């Protein structure tokens, strides 16, 4: 055994606590050497162990008769969608790497989540991304956003995976700490699903396949488990470097090997690289592994065991083939011009043994390293932040209603030009949404809808979270995020199926931060339970703060849904003149936390929109029932920017005109009526002959029917109550130009 014994000081420098260092010594029965310390520091980092979140995550609902892989069991969640098929999906973050190297940070985030999907045997169909950045008027923020989007586009386009949607949210709190959350969804036959395990097959060979191993990404897991600071800029070596063309080859070779039944198990080498893949596969299979690092294909000379075990070089997998299938495995990877090299074997003693230069460099029980095994778990102290009470004292009468008279039109145009409302075309045009010929409803709308090849089914996808809402009310804001994601799925005609989450929060050791995290988990869990949606997995990203302060809490919800008959899709916007428009649900507008309040009055304050989870479930049932009768011409979630923005987008996306009267929605303030944001509300279009039928069905579900207007051929939006009469061209200018300058060459 290598004898370079380490000290407590070394352990502290690696991000471990005094107590954790003591626990490691108890596990090993001795003081660890440097390689072992590096392995423990990576595997027990927040990024890999979820040590400060796992106890809270276990309170989320994770059961469903459709689940094929529960949260934490595999690389991603999997759910049965009938006909022998499963949908496999997950969302993950690459926040800190993007902050210091936006192109590679964002690109490798896409690559990592793709591998999580095809490692399970599923072919990726679509991807989404949820982005949070600071004000792009500032040069640094503009650089970060534009480079991150290019990284996402270049990597995804090279792989040939369509982008079905996503979101962008801009606020000053993300200036030093942007968020990049990447989601991928794939489909696989039940009998072709793969697992990240040794399968208990003692004596089987262990292969490393794919790219060579270099020094890029060393300490990546630890880097993601610390606050960003001025020194973070120097940590570029902790950012991985991706090669999408290599990933494409790796995907095809891996899927071929899985489909031919050659493998016992396969695991992506993401965070903590070989350390993570060997320990997780071994622990799941209740075995150990003996690894010879001299056999690993290196791209750099002189790498030692510490570096080899912690390298996060991209596009690599660890594979355990079935006995007798080794040569066939190698042939497949050689056909795709990829490495497939035996580096060890599965052992019976449960130990991870690492050799290099003929010497034993590390010997650690696999179970002691992994989440759910020996990795530490903590419940941190909580304290309710005082600001949560302060913001609720705000009342709308503290601001003037600036929409009176002819100002309504001017205010509407300002909101349409805001970063959080304006057109996403400068972003979505960098992504290939047509590849694979699966697009039915593409990016830029409420939810994406994609055909599932070889079936009549369609896959609905959405990501959602209003970070201002979760800042103002963590519990209700998280509930709102789940409900809005579900709404954006069912307005396509699809039934919401399951949830993956990306939990982006600040330092968990600060009691106020941990309180906010805990409340968001509670709100998310309650909403998912009531809506009958299992949480299939996801990612926790703590330490999202800089010396200037923490980000807004952002529990991003990734939602998938299934439409059994893709011919029954619902478009976001009507396509004909003479279509009646109405809001269904319970219109309860609020200016608290609204885009109007921030853009026009420069405030983030107040109570967020009231939400009744029972009504949300009934609205979902209503929309799906109406769609079964094929009487809806369109359906659009009513939320950010309020009814005025929803009507404006209807004109912009349909090219039609609208004559509207908002009497049925009228509140005591015009700005509240026009720009107040509401939960439990969907703007629908329908034939006039169906009006009374829809009204009766809506009331039968205990909801309200608010008639507001009709489409025409004028290309003009007219809102009589607000003295708004504005043409398509007038709307289009500010809406289309909002982000153009950010991405101008």
Curated annotation (Swiss-Prot):
Residues that, per the record, bind ATP: 50, 90, 501, 538
Reaction equation(s) it catalyzes: N(2)-formyl-N(1)-(5-phospho-beta-D-ribosyl)glycinamide + L-glutamine + ATP + H2O = 2-formamido-N(1)-(5-O-phospho-beta-D-ribosyl)acetamidine + L-glutamate + ADP + phosphate + H(+)
Broadest EC class assigned to this enzyme: ligase
Transmembrane segments: none
UniProt cross-references to InterPro entries, sorted A to Z: PRibForGlyAmidine_synth_PurL, PurL_linker, PurM-like_C_dom, PurM-like_C_sf, PurM-like_N, PurM-like_N_sf
Subcellular location, record wording: Cytoplasm
Chain positions recorded as Mg(2+) 1 binding sites: 92, 539
GO molecular function: ATP binding; magnesium ion binding; phosphoribosylformylglycinamidine synthase activity
SUPFAM superfamilies: PurM C-terminal domain-like, PurM N-terminal domain-like
One annotated Gene Ontology cellular component of this protein: cytoplasm
Assembly description: Monomer. Part of the FGAM synthase complex composed of 1 PurL, 1 PurQ and 2 PurS subunits.
Name of the protein in question: Phosphoribosylformylglycinamidine synthase subunit PurL
Organism: Leptospira interrogans serogroup Icterohaemorrhagiae serovar copenhageni (strain Fiocruz L1-130)
């Amino acid at each position: 055994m290598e004898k370079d014994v380490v000290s407590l000081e070394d352990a502290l420098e690696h991000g471990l606590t005094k107590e954790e260092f003591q626990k490691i010594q108890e596990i090993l029965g001795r003081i660890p050497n440097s390689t072992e310390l590096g392995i423990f520091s990576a595997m027990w980092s927040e990024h890999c162990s979820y040590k400060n979140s796992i106890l809270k995550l276990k309170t989320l609902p994770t059961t469903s008769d459709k689940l094929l892989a529960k949260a934490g069991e595999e690389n991603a969640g999997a759910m049965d969608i009938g006909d022998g098929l499963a949908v496999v999906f997950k969302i993950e973050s690459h926040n800190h790497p993007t902050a210091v190297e936006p192109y590679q940070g964002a690109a490798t985030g896409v690559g990592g989540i793709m591998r999580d999907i095809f490692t399970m045997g599923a072919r990726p169909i679509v991807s989404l991304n949820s982005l949070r950045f600071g004000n792009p008027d500032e040069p640094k923020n503009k650089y970060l956003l534009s480079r991150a989007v290019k990284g996402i586009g270049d990597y995804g386009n090279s792989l040939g995976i369509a982008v079905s949607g996503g979101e962008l949210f801009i606020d000053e709190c993300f200036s030093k700490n942007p968020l990049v959350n990447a989601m991928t969804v794939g489909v696989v036959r039940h009998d072709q699903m793969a697992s990240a395990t040794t399968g208990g097959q003692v004596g089987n060979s262990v292969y490393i396949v794919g790219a060579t191993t270099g020094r890029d990404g060393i300490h990546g897991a630890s880097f993601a488990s610390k606050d960003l600071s001025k020194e973070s800029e120097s940590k570029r070596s902790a950012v991985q470097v991706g090669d999408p063309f290599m990933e494409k080859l790796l995907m095809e070779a891996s899927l071929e090997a899985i489909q031919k039944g050659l493998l016992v198990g396969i695991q992506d080498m993401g965070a903590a690289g070989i350390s993570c893949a060997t320990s997780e596969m071994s622990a799941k299979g209740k075995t150990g592994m003996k690894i010879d690092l001299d056999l690993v294909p290196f791209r750099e000379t002189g790498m030692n065991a510490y570096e080899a075990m912690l390298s996060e070089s991209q596009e690599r997998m660890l594979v355990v083939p079935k006995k007798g299938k080794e040569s066939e495995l190698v042939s497949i990877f050689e056909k795709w011009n990829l490495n497939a090299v035996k580096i060890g074997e599965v052992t019976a003693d449960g130990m991870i043994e690492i050799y290099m230069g003929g010497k034993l460099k590390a010997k650690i029980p696999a179970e002691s390293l992994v989440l759910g095994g020996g990795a530490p778990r903590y419940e941190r102290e909580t304290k309710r932040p005082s600001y949560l009470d302060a913001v609720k004292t705000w009342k709308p009468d503290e601001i003037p209603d600036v929409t009176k008279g002819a100002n309504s039109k001017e205010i509407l145009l300002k909101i349409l030009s805001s970063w959080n409302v304006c057109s996403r075309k400068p972003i979505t045009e960098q992504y290939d949404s047509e590849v694979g010929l699966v697009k039915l409803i593409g990016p830029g709308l409420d939810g994406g809808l994609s055909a599932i090849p070889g079936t009549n089914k369609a896959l609905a996808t959405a990501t959602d979270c209003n970070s201002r809402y979760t800042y103002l009310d963590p519990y209700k804001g998280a509930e709102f995020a789940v409900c809005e994601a579900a709404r954006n799925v069912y307005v396509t005609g699809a039934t919401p199926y399951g949830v993956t989450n990306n939990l982006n929060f600040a330092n968990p050791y600060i009691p106020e931060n941990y309180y906010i995290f805990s409340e968001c988990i509670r709100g998310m869990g309650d909403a998912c339970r009531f809506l009958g949606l299992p949480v299939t997995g996801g990612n926790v990203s703590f330490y999202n703060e800089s010396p200037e302060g923490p980000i807004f809490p952002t529990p991003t919800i990734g939602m998938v849904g299934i439409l059994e008959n893709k011919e029954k899709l619902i478009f976001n916007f009507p396509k004909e003149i003479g279509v009646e428009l109405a809001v269904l649900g319970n219109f309860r507008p609020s200016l608290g936390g609204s885009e109007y309040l921030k853009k026009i009055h420069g405030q983030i304050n107040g109570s967020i929109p009231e939400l009744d989870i029972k009504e949300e479930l009934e609205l979902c049932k209503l929309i799906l029932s109406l769609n079964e009768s094929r009487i809806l011409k369109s359906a659009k979630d009513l939320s950010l920017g309020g009814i005025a923005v929803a009507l404006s987008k209807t004109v912009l996306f349909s090219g039609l005109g609208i004559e509207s009267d908002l009497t049925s929605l009228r509140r005591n303030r015009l700005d509240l009526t026009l720009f107040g944001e509401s939960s439990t509300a969907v703007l629908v279009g329908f034939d006039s002959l169906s009006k009374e039928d829809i009204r009766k069905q809506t009331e039968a579900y205990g909801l309200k029917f608010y008639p507001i207007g009709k489409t025409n051929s004028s290309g003009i939006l007219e809102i009589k109550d607000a003295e708004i009469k504005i043409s398509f061209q007038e709307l289009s200018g500010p809406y289309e130009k909002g982000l153009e300058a950010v991405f101008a060459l």
